[in-house]
């Protein structure tokens, strides 16, 4: 139960305990006082935290097979993604995902990302146009503003992808 630690495997939140662990870990990264989703968002950090909670709760309800709540949260997440242009599919990032600023972020559903990944605005992590391979991000990666990571590539642990980089070989 819980998550798989290998970055190339899918990440699953399959029980309430794992959901709480994810949210508590990410709450500390965002500097929030509690792990609850804010009802009224004031400031950029509130919107980002709300997105993070929606993403993780959607993962939980979909992975546990709760069709009603899974559908409700998928719709809620999709509306929030379209409103704020942050498109991160469920079950792609391990715990510790931190979005630095509101703005366009696009992630392919086949991407596998490890723990403690930071994403800046205007980033794309997508499959290449000529193959079906999607990037694999190891633990502790910071993706800079405007970076594009594409194709069948594996990024090492604890690196930073520079701002406005667009190279499939990074």
Segment roles from a protein language model:
Residues 15-18, 130, 169-170:
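General structural signal for secondary-structure boundaries
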Residues 1-84:
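Terminal amphipathic alpha-helical/low-complexity segments used for targeting or macromolecular assembly
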Residues 85-89:
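Conserved NTPase motor "head" modules and their coupling/switch loops across ABC/AAA+ ATPases, GTPases
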Residues 90, 95-96, 100-109, 114-115, ...:
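Left-handed beta-helix
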């Amino acid at each position: 139960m819980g998550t798989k630690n290998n970055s190339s495997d899918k990440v699953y939140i399959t029980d309430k305990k794992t959901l709480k662990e994810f949210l508590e870990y990410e709450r500390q990264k965002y500097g929030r006082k509690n792990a609850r989703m804010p009802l009224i968002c004031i400031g950029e950090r509130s919107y980002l935290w709300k997105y993070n909670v929606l993403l993780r709760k959607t993962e939980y309800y979909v992975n546990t097979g709760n069709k009603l709540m899974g559908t409700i949260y998928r719709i809620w997440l999709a509306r929030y993604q379209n409103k704020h242009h942050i498109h991160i599919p469920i079950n792609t990032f391990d715990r510790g995902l931190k979005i630095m600023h509101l703005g366009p972020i696009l992630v392919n559903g086949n991407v596998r990302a490890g723990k403690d990944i930071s994403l800046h605005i205007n980033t794309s992590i997508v499959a290449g146009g000529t193959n079906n391979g999607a990037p694999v991000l190891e633990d502790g990666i910071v993706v800079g503003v405007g970076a594009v990571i594409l194709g069948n590539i594996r990024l090492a642990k604890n690196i930073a992808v520079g701002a406005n980089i667009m190279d499939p070989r990074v």
